Amino acid sequence: MSADLALLGRQVRHELIALRRTPLTMILSIVFPLLFFVLLAAVVGNETVDSRQGVRLAQFLAPSMASFGVVMATFSFLAAGFAEARSTGALKRQGCTPLPRWALLGGRIGAALLLGLIATLLVIGTGAALYGVQVYARTLPAVLVALVLASVSFSAMGLAIALLLPTPQATIAVTNGIVVPIAFVSDTFTVNGTLPSWMSTLGWLFPLKHLVNLLGEAFNPYLTGNGFQLDHLAAIAAWGVAGALVAAWALRREQDRTSERRHPARSARASDARPRRTTSPSLVALLAGQVLHSVRLLSRNASSVFFAIAFPILLVALIPTVNGGGDQLMADGRTLGAFFAATMAGYGAAVTAYVNLPTGLAEARDDGVLQRIRGTPLPAWTLLTGRVVGAQVVALLTLAGIGVVGGLMYGTPMPAAWPAVLLTLLLATACFAVVGIAVMTVVRSASSMVGVTLGTLLPLCFISDVFVVGVSYPPVLQGLSWFFPLRHATRALTTAAGATGIDGGFSWVHLGVLAAWTLAGTAVVAVRFSSVRLEPKRHRAS
């Protein structure tokens, strides 16, 4: 028994070291729940709700953010890591070693469990130290049991998803596509509001809401008892058992398929040896080819399609709904649905141009693709311009999808000043793309690139009127938000979407700021991209 525990401990340590070397996993599973807690506390205000007992609003916010950290660490990113190991062959190679399969899976689940506990400790510890969150000794055993049970159950479900889906990109898209809507219907992001009855009922079908309520009741100062809620624990355990059964079945199916796989040899055609073109292509043809290539790169990556297109559309459907409905009128006469349609269009453009585009270039650099392209007649400006225009095409597709959803759900009409909306979106996308490429020339690896771009974009979204509106932030945050281009893009888009005439809606000051950032980013790219180290990552000196 002691030898088995030692083996499991070493495997957990191995998985934690691997996670530490993946900045994106660490940021999204540990840092983001804490960041969301801090930002939401600033948004809703940490007011004292009971001066006699010293209860503040953060007392009811911290448990939901801790639950969100657990599900992100144990469901989303355990599934993504397992799918990546399977696709690269690491899982197959580990299966050929004397390492027992239970230790292999147990190491991943144990690492995810510890990651979820760390995320919970950070949120609760920060809440207790800075926001007056009270921790009760009488409910700590119930909290620990709930966290362990939920972590194991979410891990089993994550493994099942990873084994059922064919690629890591599809796994990332599906897991996040599951977590985000369920988080909204599970009261994770709801503090002062009330969900529609159908959404509240739907939330009870999934285990996350049971965990949110378990932790919420354990930290509720007005309840007595030890915090053990057997009905919630049973619901979480039932989902875990179902996930484990599906994972076991999928694992056996995977082993059978691996043993049966054969790749038949293919013969080359004689026509492949003949050149398809006898003249040099025009610059227009080169640029069109790069634009088409950029769009194809996105369409072949399920996770990029989800975060750049599907996720903004999903938020347009969810955020207004949980805030009273998209037909609710704001102070300036605009509907909530129309406002968030404009902000989500800007968010989708930022994800496409500032996160996905430069990350793709960084991956191409690490794989040696950019180095090989440099040895061809393709001009560098054509490559980069094609990527920027491709990002603009994707941003327009996202805008079209948002318009369809807004029209169907809230009756949002097409903006009267649609030329201003299109011009603003195109300029904002170009600005985000150029700034992202400039950042790529400074950051050394693709994995770090994701952490830098996503780690700066999401906090700015909270203080730039993207996810929330009408919140008064401290002067420092206000000034910071107006310094970067995201808030100018958001304000220009919402102004254009709310204009009443076809010839209006142009926010020249905000457009000027976007143009200035674009020019500054272009200057950095012009200086840095030609001298950036393009050799494959494995050939660089450490």
Label each PLM-derived region with a short phrase:
Residues D4-L7, E15-T88, T120, Y136-T139, ...:
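Transmembrane helix-boundary elements of multi-pass transport/secretion proteins
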Residues S51-R52, D187-A242, D465-G521:
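Membrane-interfacial helix-loop-helix junctions in multi-pass membrane proteins
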Residues V31, V38-E47, L165-L205, K209, ...:
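Transmembrane helix segments
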Residues M1-V12, W198-L208, R269-V291, V476-L486:
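Short, membrane-interfacial amphipathic segments enriched in basic
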